[in-house]
Regions:
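Conserved glycine-rich Rossmann-like NAD(P)H-binding loop of the short-chain dehydrogenase/reductase
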Residues: 29-46
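C-terminal substrate-recognition "lid" of short-chain dehydrogenase/reductases
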Residues: 179, 213-242
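Substrate-binding pocket helix/loop in short-chain dehydrogenase/reductase
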Residues: 99-100, 107-112, 194, 205
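Alpha-helical segment proximal to the catalytic Tyr-Lys
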Residues: 128, 172-176, 233
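Conserved glycine-rich cofactor-binding loop
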Residues: 8, 15-17
Length: 247
């Protein structure tokens, strides 16, 4: 049985979607939750209330994941509040999809900063604490697009592929300190982003998936739970795809 009782997790970009599902599932297993998003809103307030109703401590910190200094401030606030940090989930992400010839420098920079630089920011800030503890699990959210690419998503694909190389390198640096680092590569998952697509576009997406359906956010969260728990105590430097056999 998975038990995260007394552990502390920080999840970036967690007010909605996959991050929210991870926060709720971790809380169901006794984990105290700190989470970030770009600003406080109804989603973040509702998640805080829901987490507290599950009997765990919950802390929301509004923060821009792409800001290096802010990431260090967030980690310090988490440690000051909970006394430790056991699990880091780098989940913050955005898209600015367009064909390469139409892509602006700003669209490229925005996606790389939020999706990839944020992983560096938070890992850089969190690893000293985890090294002092001589334990920790780092989980970063990549994507099927980071593995196989996708037309119109060169910036997004580059950011998600970069996460894979970063996590594999980090696992080799930190393994001797009993800190594990892994990535999850979701396929098409039902989130507000995919639900907003026209029905015909979503139908075409589903045709590409051998299991003939989109994934649920909870299905990604279950993999994160495995990677956060002792069930994966000898798993590090891996990329686990959650894509319905799409890749």
């Amino acid at each position: 049985m998975i038990n995260l009782q007394g552990k502390t997790a920080l999840i970036t970009g967690a007010s909605r979607g996959i991050g929210r599902a991870i926060a709720l599932l971790f809380a169901d297993h006794g984990c105290n939750i700190a989470f970030t998003d770009i600003c406080e809103n109804q989603d973040s307030n509702e998640l805080t209330t829901t987490l507290q109703a599950k009997g765990v401590q919950a802390l929301f910190i509004p923060s821009n994941a792409a800001d290096f200094t802010a990431a260090h401030d967030v980690i310090q606030q988490v440690v000051d509040t909970f006394g430790k940090l056991d699990i880091l989930v780098c989940n913050a992400g955005i898209t600015r999809d367009t064909l390469l010839m139409r892509m602006t420098e700003q669209q490229w920079d925005d996606v790389l900063n939020v999706n990839l630089k944020s992983v560096f920011n938070y890992c850089h800030a969190a690893t000293p604490q985890m090294m002092r503890q001589r334990s920790g699990s780092i989980i970063a959210m990549s994507s099927v697009v980071g593995i196989g690419g996708n037309a119109g998503q060169a910036n997004y694909a580059a950011s998600k592929a970069g996460i894979i190389g970063f996590i594999k390198s980090l696992s080799k640096e930190l393994g001797a300190r009993n800190i594990r680092a892994n990535a999850i590569a979701p396929g098409f998952i039902l989130t507000e982003m995919t639900l907003a697509l026209p029905d015909e576009v979503r139908a075409e997406m589903i045709k590409m998936i051998p299991m003939r359906r989109c994934g649920e956010t909870e299905e990604v969260a279950k993999v994160a739970l495995f990677l956060a728990s002792d069930l994966s105590s000898y798993v590090s430097g891996q990329v686990i795809s959650v894509n319905g056999a799409m890749g």
